[in-house]
Amino acid sequence: MEKIRIDLVRLKTEEDALKRFGRLKGMPADYNSELEELRAILQAWDKPLKIEIVIGGNIGPFTKLMEMLEDVRTTNNNLLFVVIMYMA
């Protein structure tokens, strides 16, 4: 199973969170997808994928991310979400 880790703890502002997410295995190490790019990738994903989301004290970015993921999950049942609660 492929895995993507979206670490919101390291992002300082909501703008950062909307621009920089984790990368999928096989992508270059410096690749950071924007939210809309991530949406397109996940909608087309055809293998099981585990998505780990690490959040901190700022839940604004988390809320926007979860809205997008819930929307994608309605069209792609290969996605498994694991939310890791971490208070920075």
Please state what every model-predicted region is.
Residues 3-12, 85-87:
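A short hydrophobic beta-strand->loop->alpha-helix junction that borders the nucleotide-binding pocket
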